[in-house]
Structure formats: C-alpha cells, structure tokens
Amino acid sequence: MNTFQDQSGSSSNREPLLRCSDARRDLELAIGGVLRAEQQIKDNLREVKAQIHSCISRHLECLRSREVWLYEQVDLIYQLKEETLQQQAQQLYSLLGQFNCLTHQLECTQNKDLANQVSVCLERLGSLTLKPEDSTVLLFEADTITLRQTITTFGSLKTIQIPEHLMAHASSANIGPFLEKRGCISMPEQKSASGIVAVPFSEWLLGSKPASGYQAPYIPSTDPQDWLTQKQTLENSQTSSRACNFFNNVGGNLKGLENWLLKSEKSSYQKCNSHSTTSSFSIEMEKVGDQELPDQDEMDLSDWLVTPQESHKLRKPENGSRETSEKFKLLFQSYNVNDWLVKTDSCTNCQGNQPKGVEIENLGNLKCLNDHLEAKKPLSTPSMVTEDWLVQNHQDPCKVEEVCRANEPCTSFAECVCDENCEKEALYKWLLKKEGKDKNGMPVEPKPEPEKHKDSLNMWLCPRKEVIEQTKAPKAMTPSRIADSFQVIKNSPLSEWLIRPPYKEGSPKEVPGTEDRAGKQKFKSPMNTSWCSFNTADWVLPGKKMGNLSQLSSGEDKWLLRKKAQEVLLNSPLQEEHNFPPDHYGLPAVCDLFACMQLKVDKEKWLYRTPLQM
C-alpha cells in the first residue's frame, strides 16, 4: 500500500514539475528573443543614424554647391555690368577731352574750323547717353518658406509590427528580414488564407538599392512552414503569371539575341571563308527555369547553329597551301642582326635594382646613364606610347653630338643654346648631301655605298678574306687588259684545261719534286704567266657592289689555287679509294666544288690557309 501511495504521489508531483519546466523554458526563450530584439534594435539604430547623417550631409553638399554656383553667377553679372559701364565711361572721357581742347583753342584764337569741330562734337554728345546704360540693381530672391518647410518635413521614421507566429520562433533569421527594410518605406502586412505573409513578386527581383546604409545579408528561414508549398490565392496567381511573363520575355530576348549573333557569325564566316579554316562550333541556349520558350516550334535549331564541317573539308587543300605560303613568308622577312647580339649590361641590372658603383674615371664606359633617372620619369600616356611606336624606326639625318657647336653638346636640337640653331645648318648640309652636292652646292660624284648586310655581318663574324684583299687591292684593271686576258684564254690549247694523270705510288719522296717541276712549267707557259696578273673577280657577275670589283689582289691567283687543289686531290687517299678517272671532275671550277664536298683529308692544309705560290 505504501508503495502505491508513493507512486501516486510522485505522479501527481510530476505534472506540476513538467509544467514548471515548460514555463521556464518558454520564459528563457522569450527572454532570449527579447534580448536579441534589443540587440537588433541597437544595430538598427546605428544603421538609421548613419542613413540620416549620410542623407542630410549629401543634401548639405548640394546646398553648398548651389551656394557656390550662385556666387559664380553674381560675379559673372558683375563683370558684364562693369564692362558696359567702363565702355560708356571711356566714350564720355574721350568726348570730354575733345571739349576741353576746343575750349582752350577758342579762348586763344578764333577760327571757323574750330566752330565746325564744335558742331561735330555736339552732335556726338547728342547721340551719347548721359545716364548709366546698365542698372545697378542686383537682388537675391529665395523662397525661404518652401525651403524651411521642406527641411522641417524632410525624412520620416516608420516601424513595422512583427507577426505573432514569427515571434514564437523569435530569432535573428526571422526578425532580420523585417528589420532590414528601407527606413522611409513601410511594408503593410499581407496575410494569405494560411496565415503566412505573402511577399510581392517585385521584392524577389533585383532592384535599385539606396547607395547609403548597410544591408544585412539574406539568411534563410528556419521555420519549416516557410519551406512548404502554400495554397495559391488570387494574389499568388497574379504573381505567378507575372513570373511567367517575365521568363517569357527573357526567353524572347535571348532568342532575339541568338538571331543577332547568328547574323554576325555568318557574315564573319563568309568573310574568312577563303582565308582561314573555321572550326565547327555551336551555340547552346540555357533553359530559363522550367518555362518553355515561345515560338519554339516555329524556329528550327539549324537556323542558328553554325556547323560548317563539310565546307571545312572541301576547303582544306586550298587553306593548307595558303598556310604553307604564309609560313614560307616568314623566311623572306628582313631581320636585324643586332637583335641576335648580346646587349650591353645595364648598370641597374643587378640584385635589388641598385646601380653599380662606378669610378669617376670610368664614367665614359657607361652605356645607360639614363637608367638612373627611370624612376623620375613620368608615366607614359597612350599618346606618348603611340609617338614612341611611330618613331621607333626613325633615324635622324644627323646626330646632335656631331653637329652642335656649343662647349657642352646639347641633348636635342630643341635645347640648342647657340645663336643660330644647329638643326637648320645640319639639315641644310644633309639635304645637299642627299642631292649629291657639297657644302657649296657643287655636284659631287656619288660614291658607291657598301652593302648593308656585310656591315652587319662583320659585327659578329670573323673578318673575311675579301675585306682584307680589298684593303690591299691595287687600282682597277683597264678594259684593254681584260680583253687581252680573254684573248690569251681563247687562244690557249684545250689540253691546258684537262686534269693531269695521277702519279704512281712507291715514290712519295718524289712528289714534291714533281710538284715543283709542274709549278715551274706552269709559270713558263704563256697562259700561266697571263693568269698570274689576271684578276678573276672581273669575270664574276657583280651584285650591288659595282665599284669594288677590281680591287681584289692579283697576288692571290685563284686559278692557280684551283689547279693546286686538283693536284692535292689527285695525290690524296681519296683518289686511291675511289680510283676516279682523270677526266672525272671536268673543269677546274667543278673539281674545286666537288673537292669541298667529298675530301676526307685534313682540310686545314688547303681550306683555311693560303697555299704558297710556286
């Protein structure tokens, strides 16, 4: 019995305990909601004050700007009136001076001409206005009553009532969207049949927000009822129809945009049809929501999808040949050898971009003195960049350092400090030089200009043999001497042009003797004697260098060098391996050509060294 009574007593005490715990939990939740609301009100207070300050400050700036504008207008009106009155005063002063002169002359002498002048001055006086031509009244009118009323009634503060069902789940996520509304706009409560606040469709669209004021980020609701599908009322059906119209308009705009893109792509495709290959591509349109695009059956996708695979295959050979020709064009483009040469190190090309320490005695070795001033140079504007691009390949006809007559040469002609600008004199001399005249205007025989590519190649190649020979070359041969040499060659027997039979093996020590005898026989024959003084460069077809053909040295007899190469080839192991016939090589020039290609002996003996003359 006692146990039953204890159980009944405990069950009777449990119900009040549960009620107390529920009430305490509700109170704690309510207190938490109130505290959060208080904190949100404080935050909202700061936001509203910031909005008020920003709005008032901006309108005060507008008033200040209006004040400055009115000051400028007053100054402008004052200047106009002052100029008008000054012109009138000048005319009156001029006429007053004339009357003073006439009065003085009339007091001294009596002359009829003076009477005529007096009448003219009186007529001018009658035509002038003696009163000020412009008024001196300048007033400022302001509708202070309207301005004061507008200022006193400017702005308003409104608040909204939070729905009860949201107060039950009071949280920052639920209260936030209602507290972050604009300060000057109040949203009336719109309850649907289910009791949920219906938000208009316009609130879901991206609209213009005020520039000032902090907008809290959107936080999704934690209430499950907000995520369930609600029954559509009349207003909800209207908003859904507006959504359909909106998406239809978006789809129509996209469709028109695709048609516009189709035209431009087709036109550009037709332009580049014969020039370059076009890769197949297609334009895909995203579906906007679940709404179908209008007029989808009327429009075929093939009308705006561009897929030119077949035409691309047909044009492939032609375009391939064109691409090949474009690639070969690169081989014939002009180039500058200086682009391949090593550039001089900049004095700022070190770690930390700090200039190197240079002694005063070695300042002349610096190539980039202006690099130290790069930090002080102003930033280049687009116009300056365009000018630099236009003049990057421009070469001045004369240098300032070579022309300037000042003690310290100027950096440019514009900064020349001479009495007469050096640029004019230098330009005059340059024009005379271009016309083929000297400084006195007399015509001068033009000197042949050396080839440009040779100068560029000599910058980084070893000095060539021709350049050395040209410095030591004698005067040009006369035409009669060339004709005599040609006559000697024409009358020479054909046996002189054939290759001699090779020498037998077993007597290697006699080879130098036979070569000496062969050399002596060469000098004894009239043809060989004529070749010694005969310059073969006169028989070579010249390029652009017409004046330096006869400057080659006659001591370097190339015909003898070719015959010497024959003998070296016939006595070399190459002849023993292949057993070439005596007339295998033909003329000496052909022999020399193939010897350069097939000779396996040490080329240092005859290719890079000049053979000794016998």
UniProtKB/Swiss-Prot annotation:
The organism's place on the tree of life at top rank: Eukaryota
UniProt note on tissues of expression: Widely expressed. Also detected in adipose tissues and in different cell lines. Isoform Beta is only expressed in testis.
UniProt feature, compositional bias: Basic and acidic residues: 502-519
Region (Disordered): 501-524
Disease listed for this protein: A chromosomal aberration involving NCOA4 is found in papillary thyroid carcinomas (PTCs). Inversion inv(10)(q11.2;q11.2) generates the RET/NCOA4 (PTC3) oncogene.
Subunit structure: Interacts with the ferritin complex, an oligomeric structure composed of varying combinations of ferritin heavy chains and ferritin light chains. Interacts (via C-terminus) with ferritin heavy chain FTH1 (via 'Arg-23'); thereby targeting the iron-binding ferritin complex to autolysosomes following starvation or iron depletion. Interacts with ferritin light chain FTL. Interacts (via C-terminus) with ATG8-like proteins GABARAP and GABARAPL1; thereby mediating localization to autophagosomes and ferritinophagy. Interacts with MAP1LC3C/LC3C and GABARAPL2.
Protein name: Nuclear receptor coactivator 4
Organism expressing this protein natively: Homo sapiens
Lineage: Eukaryota, Metazoa, Chordata, Craniata, Vertebrata
Gene behind the chain: NCOA4
